[in-house]
């Protein structure tokens, strides 16, 4: 689960390396976000020459969490790190590549472009 002030790695080539969560979107007073949820973040580390610069405020969708997510069949999916993909307002990614596996829950939340770019969907 991701909450305010949580740091995540960025799993795309938009230029950002690490982001800090400012706000969890989707409801008044919502505290935590899980896989497939959209959060507002600020870029804490960035690569030189990237599309996204350090200090920029961006929207991101969570693609991997350490705490994991419960599936409909009762199974759980957990990852080794917390990671996100920076998106535009129309849910399309700002980068052109996705690094690492992403969860199947993104397909249910209509992030089809991210699912198609990902090397593996678990």
From Swiss-Prot:
One of its GO terms (cellular component) is cytosolic large ribosomal subunit. Gene3D superfamilies: Ribosomal protein L14. SUPFAM superfamilies: Ribosomal protein L14. PROSITE patterns: RIBOSOMAL_L14. Keywords: Ribonucleoprotein, Ribosomal protein, RNA-binding, rRNA-binding. Pfam families: Ribosomal_L14. One of its GO terms (biological process) is translation. GO terms for molecular function: large ribosomal subunit rRNA binding; structural constituent of ribosome. InterPro entries: Ribosomal_uL14, Ribosomal_uL14_bac-type, Ribosomal_uL14_CS, Ribosomal_uL14_sf. Belongs to the universal ribosomal protein uL14 family. HAMAP family: Ribosomal_uL14 (MF_01367). Part of the 50S ribosomal subunit. Forms a cluster with proteins L3 and L19. In the 70S ribosome, L14 and L19 interact and together make contacts with the 16S rRNA in bridges B5 and B8. Binds to 23S rRNA. Forms part of two intersubunit bridges in the 70S ribosome. This is Large ribosomal subunit protein uL14.
């Amino acid at each position: 689960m991701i909450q305010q002030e949580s740091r995540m790695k960025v799993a795309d080539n938009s230029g950002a390396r690490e982001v800090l969560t400012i706000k969890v979107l989707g409801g008044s007073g919502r505290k935590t976000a899980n896989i497939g949820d959209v959060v507002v973040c600020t870029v804490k580390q960035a690569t030189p020459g990237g599309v996204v610069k350090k200090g920029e405020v961006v929207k991101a969708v969570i693609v991997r969490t350490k705490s994991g997510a419960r599936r409909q069949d009762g199974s759980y999916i957990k990852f080794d790190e917390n990671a996100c993909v920076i998106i535009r307002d129309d849910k399309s990614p700002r980068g052109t590549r996705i690094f690492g596996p992403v969860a199947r829950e993104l397909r249910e939340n209509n992030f089809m472009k991210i699912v198609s770019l990902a090397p593996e969907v678990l």
